[in-house]
Amino acid sequence: MDRLLNIGFIKIGYWELLDGQLHYIMTESFNDVCNNLYAFICDGEVKYIGKTTRLLKKRMYHYKKPGMSQSTNIKNNAYIREALLQNIAVDILVLPDNGLMHYGQFHLNLAAGLEDSIIKTINPEWNGGSKDLTDQSQIEADLNTNTFDDKFQHEFLKFESKDHCFNMA
């Protein structure tokens, strides 16, 4: 957790069970902030890292009441409930985007830029070992296990075998 605090994450709330229902309590000033990187922390251990471009309160609502097809929300709802039932506090930390970072005229979404790196470095349990989709070894493994259909793989290898190698990802 200290690594997150050192880069600017702040505690803004926590999860609780009231009459068997999951609820989140957050500092009002962060309810209506967009482009956030957030974390769920149990006993000082980072359990989950996520990002949202939506309002933070709306993102938390989907963990509170996940839809039937929202597998990440369903899993995290269960993890949060399990921790709370074991009397383990689940805190909510956030790294808000102040909107000041730009590359030329383009706004840089800090949450989008940091999420994969933080997950890869910290490897939070509830993230389920997310992998970097740009990892060349994973791309090669996918090619070797025929995850692409034969036609695409043939075209990919045809491009790769010429004098130039093109990244088709």
Show where each model-derived region lies.
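Boundary/linker segments flanking structured domains
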Residues: 1-35, 42-47, 53-169
